[in-house]
């Protein structure tokens, strides 16, 4: 009878990537047969995470990522043996898997990306805020690999589709992180931050503001474009209700514009603020942005 230790050892000893996938499936069958508790009680998850962080042996990092990907695919989500799958236990795998995006070994890197691809869709929209916090810590870290930061930014882009409403609720926290990413010295991070900002701003449901999303993102990247953006916005006749996601992007822009030296920009900004305030119907939304 297979034990978890034997299944793990077979995974570590696998002679090829294809062989590793077969042994990883055997491991998931063991977990599904003996219960989710084995992930912790038999230290299966600890073993996978330890090997994922192995500094010397790239093949072990690859095997561990393959194992985690299999657990995400076979012991969680729609394939979970019971309503509660392995998702809560897999949260701690996110930072080391993202770190694997920068692995010098191509096979280990590919396995880490595959595991994250299987893991991210498992998180329900209600868990988006917790997942975002983990991604923020990677993007703003001074020690994280640039590939990990790019990977975290791409995941935020995916969340804009997977958890549309929740990303809208979190825009106030997301935009400063993305702005920091835009100013990274590594061009790949900066470019992805701009793409991600454009994607997440797509959750704004205000049809008056949506055509100006590229301009709003441009202001995050280049503050010197604020006067031109304000000039464009001042020509709008706002009629659509202004909700939280719209304010999350507009308030930082208007705050910056009101500090511009140009009285013309300040005057235009005040007019925009006045027009927006009239269209905020939810007092709870307005209260979030009151000084």
Residue ranges and their predicted role:
Residues 15-30, 58-71, 78, 106-115, ...:
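HEAT-repeat alpha-solenoid elements in large eukaryotic scaffold proteins
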Residues 10-85, 119-120, 201, 238-242:
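Alpha-helical solenoid scaffolds in large eukaryotic transport, assembly, and signaling factors
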Residues 5-8, 46, 65, 94-95, ...:
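Generic N-terminal initiation segments characterized by hydrophobic and/or small/turn-forming residues
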Residues 35, 60, 76, 109, ...:
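Short linear functional motifs in flexible/disordered or boundary regions
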Residues 2-9, 38-52, 79-101, 126-141, ...:
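HEAT/HEAT-like alpha-solenoid repeats
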Residues 37-39, 86-87, 146, 160-161, ...:
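Short leucine-rich amphipathic alpha-helices used at interfaces
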Residues 27-32, 67-81, 101, 115-123, ...:
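Hydrophobic residues within the alpha-helices of tandem HEAT/HEAT-like
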């Amino acid at each position: 009878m297979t034990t978890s230790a034997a299944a793990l050892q077979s995974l570590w000893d696998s002679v090829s990537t294809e062989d590793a996938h077969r042994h990883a499936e055997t491991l998931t069958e063991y977990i599904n047969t003996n219960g989710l508790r084995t992930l912790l009680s038999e230290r299966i998850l600890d073993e996978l995470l330890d090997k994922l962080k192995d500094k010397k042996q790239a093949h072990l990092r690859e095997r561990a990522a393959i194992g985690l990907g299999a657990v995400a695919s076979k012991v969680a989500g729609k394939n979970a043996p019971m309503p509660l799958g392995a998702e809560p236990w897999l949260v701690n795998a996110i930072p080391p898997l993202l770190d694997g995006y920068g692995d010098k070994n191509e096979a280990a890197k590919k396995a880490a990306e595959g595991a994250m691809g299987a893991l991210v869709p498992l998180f329900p929209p209600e868990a988006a805020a917790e997942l975002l916090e983990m991604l923020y810590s990677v993007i703003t870290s001074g020690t994280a690999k640039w590939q990990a930061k790019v990977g975290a930014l791409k995941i935020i882009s995916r969340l804009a589709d997977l958890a549309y409403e929740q990303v809208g609720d979190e825009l106030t926290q997301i935009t400063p992180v993305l702005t920091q990413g835009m100013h990274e010295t590594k061009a790949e991070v900066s470019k992805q931050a701009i793409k991600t900002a454009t994607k997440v701003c797509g959750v704004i449901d205000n049809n008056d503001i949506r055509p100006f999303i590229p301009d709003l993102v441009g202001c995050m990247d280049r503050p010197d474009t604020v006067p031109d953006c304000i000039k464009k916005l001042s020509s709008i006749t706002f009629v659509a209700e202004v909700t939280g996601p719209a304010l999350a992007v507009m308030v930082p822009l208007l705050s910056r514009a009101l500090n511009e030296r140009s009285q013309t920009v300040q005057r235009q900004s005040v007019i925009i603020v006045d027009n927006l305030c009239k269209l905020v119907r939810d007092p709870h939304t307005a209260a979030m942005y009151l000084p």
